[in-house]
Amino acid sequence: MVKFPLEVAAGTPVRRQAGLLAAASIFGLISSSVLAAAANTPIGVLQATPASLQGVVDTIPLASHRAVYDLTLLKAVGTKSPTGARGRIAFDFSGSACDGYVQNFRQLTELQPAEGPTRISDMHSATFEDGSGKSFSFKMETMVDDEPSDQVDGRAQRLTRGPVGVDLVKPKPEQLAFGHDVLFPTEHIKYILAAAKAGENTLEVRVFDGSDTGDKIFDTTTFIGRPIDTPAPEAAAQIPMLEHMRRWPVTISYFDDARNDEAPNYTLSFDLYENGISRALRLNYGDFVLAGEMKSLKLLPTPPCTK
């Protein structure tokens, strides 16, 4: 039995990805978060393109920080959905455009199905992303009920005037090539912030984050709501840096690259501060939705540029 609260030491690997609960095989039709985001989008949708945002992206600083979020079951629909869920996310982010970005993530989730025993999923990931978006190294491991389930290990490299090449080590050695328009995760967040600051409402980009089996990219659609500048209600977010900082309600839908239908694999919603910190997480898997409340936040120093 997993014990809560989960204590995660600094540097313990972990992150958002398509396989957060893949071990539980729970994916389905996801539409409620997308519709909610669309309802909050100003009339006259403005859609951003990566090319139009490049100049803004290069100037966006991201705050090094460590955040912990408690997960609870917000909504469950249908016979396949769990009757109970709880968990915790620990997120470590540090670095700069000069030296690159290190991201460590752990998500521990306990699900109680309608029938059968409780299932526990424990996912870790550690990534490094070059500050200019030229390379991305990733390592992920998932345990289900204390048994190894999935391992992914590899490196992606943006080739000069060419595609993004991926060298996979696990789950099996493989070399892949994707289009030149693919973004890496931190780069993706910076483009969302650039679009928000430019007053855009929608951003559509292709993303590679090494998730699932490390061999696929996702088409993503991001809806950006009106900016909020009032303090957040949870105590963890009530720090001087965030008190009057703008944040935007953001909803990101992740689709398979093939996109044979219009139903995303899953949808992630959160409030995104202009320094990259997130609060009020909503992870929508179709049959059920998990809410993530920020329980602690620690700002970390960003080392001076070594180049």
Regions found by a protein language model. Name each.
Residues 4-22:
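Bacterial N-terminal signal peptides that target proteins for export
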Residues 58-63, 92-101, 128-134, 241-243, ...:
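A short, structured loop/turn motif at beta-sheet edges
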Residues 105-157:
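Hydrophobic/aromatic-rich structural module bridging two neighboring secondary-structure elements via a short loop
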Residues 22-33:
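Bacterial N-terminal signal peptides
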Residues 87-94, 122-129, 156, 268-271:
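Hydrophobic/aromatic beta-strand elements that line small-molecule binding cavities or substrate pockets
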Residues 68-74, 105-110, 138-143, 250-257:
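Short beta-strand segments that buttress and anchor functional surface loops
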Residues 36-100, 104-115:
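N-terminal cleavable signal peptides for secretion/export
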Residues 139-307:
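Mature, soluble, non-transmembrane domains
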